[in-house]
């Protein structure tokens, strides 16, 4: 309960080792003394919380929830409910003396010690029977000492009258005088103590049931989370075992393949095989040597990768990032983009010269923007941006017409001034300047309105950008799949071309060894060719026995 205890409880699990008694402080492990209730409904002794507040906020030692505290003490108010429970459950050794015989009676003997409310004095059991047996004491109000301590709160502190009613509106006990002082509409909410007690018990029972249901649901959720943690651990162990098994099997397969390759390399060929295939091997080696080879590396040793851009591109869908349009602002000038060039809004204190205004007419919308807007409006899609474009075109045409009107008037004045060397219509100069200021204010208002829609359109554009990014990713994956199929087909074609000579050779030898596979000869003109083939193939049986083991190795 000392203010020097500042050991932090690491989460709710720290309560497992402490006492689960509801009247014991989780910090000092002693009975509450002036318990204080925090906003997170955790309670601690006032002494345990003293000195923990910082900047008007008090962090809960259990869950770190911030509670706003007021006053110089830096402590929340004392919890009257828990304080009552602590006082009611106390087993103190308060000693009272009998007013007649001075017999000491402890508070634990409150049920066998009495108190006379009429006399205002405590009495032991023997003196109660001896002194208050007479008829003159028959009207004295004698109650047990414990009952007297509980009856102290049964009288109004304002009027010293016993409580008879309870206000369900203000949640307070009322005596008869408090009831009389209340307004008429407030008396409707007053009920007798017995009815209020029954209603309070029912509501308390309902609240207890709700808390028990919450405890049950919380316990089930904790069990579910624990089961899920066990499943995650078991799944991780199974995945690790699967990876280890796959790695071991891969090592075994690679070892077997290594042994087979080494055996094939280390096998010796006989002289016939060497004479039959050696020169072909030499020709291949000579061809390999004569082919151009790049003996120097074409790349440098420095590794450069666009990993930052790749990371940024991967994080864009998660952080809802998209192409941002930078809005430039400087001084008192605002730049409007979307025309042939920047349009500058100047304040009333800096009017543009007449010559510059005549030399820089109001720029009309670009052909690209006009055509794009017309196409967008012609599509008929109902979207916020379409409605904005439709409203913008109307406002822009109106402002453009006003600017053209002012331009014509100023050009006419300028023409009169240059021709006649005098200002013919001086009275309309003020009107033109006033209208120009009004148009300037309208343009600024329209610009602010359009600029205010940036956040709405930016969110819509970000969604569209995410969809386009997903489509691009799918498109690139499709191209990659097609390239992979093309590469596999190239490998297949190469392998087929490599094994074609061997298959044809085996087929010819098989035709010579098995006459039933031979094609019947119908035309006599083929006999000379067949005679030549017999001479060529006469040596085939002798070569088959020599080539067959080598070809089997090659095919395998």
Curated annotation (Swiss-Prot):
Top-rank lineage group of the source organism: Eukaryota
Annotated Zn(2+) binding sites: 98, 101, 127, 132
**Keywords per UniProt:** Coiled coil, Cytoplasm, Metal-binding, Zinc, Zinc-finger
Compositional bias ranges of the Basic and acidic residues kind: 524-535
Q: What cellular component GO annotations does this protein have?
A: perinuclear region of cytoplasm
Could you say which residue ranges form the zinc fingers (RING-type)? Answer: 25-64
Q: Cite the GO molecular-function annotations of the record.
A: Hsp70 protein binding; transmembrane transporter binding; zinc ion binding
PROSITE patterns noted in UniProt: ZF_BBOX (PS50119), ZF_RING_1 (PS00518), ZF_RING_2 (PS50089)
Localization recorded for this chain is: Cytoplasm
Annotated GO biological processes are: regulation of cardiac muscle contraction; regulation of heart looping
Q: Per the database entry, which stretches of residues form a coiled coil?
A: 218-273, 385-425
- Note the zinc finger regions (B box-type) by start and end residue: 93-145
Segments carrying the region annotation (Disordered) are 517-556
Primary localization class, coarse: cytoplasm
InterPro entries in the record: RNF207 (IPR039320), Znf_B-box (IPR000315), Znf_C3HC4_RING-type (IPR018957), Znf_RING (IPR001841), Znf_RING/FYVE/PHD (IPR013083), Znf_RING_CS (IPR017907)
Q: What function is annotated for this protein?
A: Plays a role in cardiac repolarization possibly by stabilizing membrane expression of the potassium channel KCNH2/HERG, or by assisting its synthesis, folding or export from the endoplasmic reticulum, in a heat shock protein-dependent manner.
Complexes and interactors: Interacts with the core-glycosylated, but not the fully glycosylated form of KCNH2/HERG. Interacts with DNAJA1 and HSPA8. Interacts (via the C-terminus) with HSPA1A; this interaction additively increases KCNH2 expression.
Q: What is this protein called?
A: RING finger protein 207
């Amino acid at each position: 309960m000392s203010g020097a205890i500042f050991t932090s409880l690491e989460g709710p699990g720290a309560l497992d080792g402490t006492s689960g008694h509801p009247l014991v402080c989780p910090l000092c492990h002693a009975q509450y003394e002036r318990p204080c209730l925090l906003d997170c409904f955790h309670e601690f002794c006032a002494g345990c919380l003293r000195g923990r507040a910082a900047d008007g906020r008090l962090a809960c030692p259990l869950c770190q929830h911030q509670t706003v505290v007021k006053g110089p003490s830096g402590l929340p108010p004392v919890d009257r409910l828990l304080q009552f429970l602590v006082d009611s459950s106390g087993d103190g050794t308060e000693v009272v003396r009998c007013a007649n015989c001075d017999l000491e009676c402890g508070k634990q003997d409150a049920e066998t010690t009495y108190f006379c409310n009429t006399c205002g004095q405590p009495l032991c059991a023997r003196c109660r029977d001896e002194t208050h047996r007479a008829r003159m004491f028959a009207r004295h109000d004698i109650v047990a000492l414990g009952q007297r301590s509980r009856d102290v709160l049964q009288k109004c502190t304002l009027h010293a009258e016993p409580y008879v009613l309870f206000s369900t509106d203000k949640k307070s006990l009322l005596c008869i005088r408090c009831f009389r002082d209340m307004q008429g509409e407030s008396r409707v909410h007053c009920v007798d103590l017995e009815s209020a007690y029954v209603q309070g018990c029912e509501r308390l029972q309902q609240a207890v049931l709700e808390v028990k249901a919450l405890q049950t649901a919380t316990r089930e959720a904790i069990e579910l989370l624990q089961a899920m943690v066990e499943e995650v651990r078991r799944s991780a162990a199974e995945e690790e075992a699967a990876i280890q098994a796959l790695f071991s099997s891969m090592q075994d397969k690679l070892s077997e393949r290594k042994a087979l390759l080494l055996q094939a390399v280390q096998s010796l060929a006989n002289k016939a095989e060497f004479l039959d295939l050696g020169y072909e091997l030499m020709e291949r080696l000579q061809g390999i040597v004569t082919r151009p080879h790049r003996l120097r590396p074409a790349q440098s040793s420095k590794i450069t990768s666009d990993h930052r851009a790749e990371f940024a591109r991967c994080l864009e869908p998660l952080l809802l990032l998209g192409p941002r349009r930078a809005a430039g602002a400087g001084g008192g000038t605002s730049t409007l983009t979307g025309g042939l060039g920047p349009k500058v809004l100047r304040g009333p204190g800096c009017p543009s010269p007449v010559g510059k205004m005549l030399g820089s007419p109001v720029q009309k919308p670009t052909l690209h923007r006009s055509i794009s807007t017309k196409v967008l409006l012609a599509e008929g899609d109902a979207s916020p941006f379409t409605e904005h474009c439709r409203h913008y075109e109307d406002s822009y045409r109106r402002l453009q017409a006003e600017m053209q009107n002012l331009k014509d008037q100023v050009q006419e004045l300028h023409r009169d001034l240059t021709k006649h060397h005098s200002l013919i219509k001086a009275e309309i100069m003020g009107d033109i300047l006033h209208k120009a200021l009004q148009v300037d204010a309208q343009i600024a208002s329209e610009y602010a309105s359009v600029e205010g829609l940036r956040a709405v359109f930016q969110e819509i554009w970000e969604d569209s950008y995410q969809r386009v990014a997903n489509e691009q990713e799918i498109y690139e994956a499709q191209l990659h799949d097609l390239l992979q199929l093309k590469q596999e087909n190239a490998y297949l074609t190469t392998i087929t071309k490599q094994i074609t000579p061997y298959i044809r050779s085996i087929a010819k030898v098989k035709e010579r060894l098995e006459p039933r596979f031979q094609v019947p000869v119908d035309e006599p003109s083929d006999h000379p060719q067949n005679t030549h083939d017999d001479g060529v193939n006469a040596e085939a049986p002798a070569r088959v026995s020599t080539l067959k083991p080598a070809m089997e190795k090659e095919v395998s």
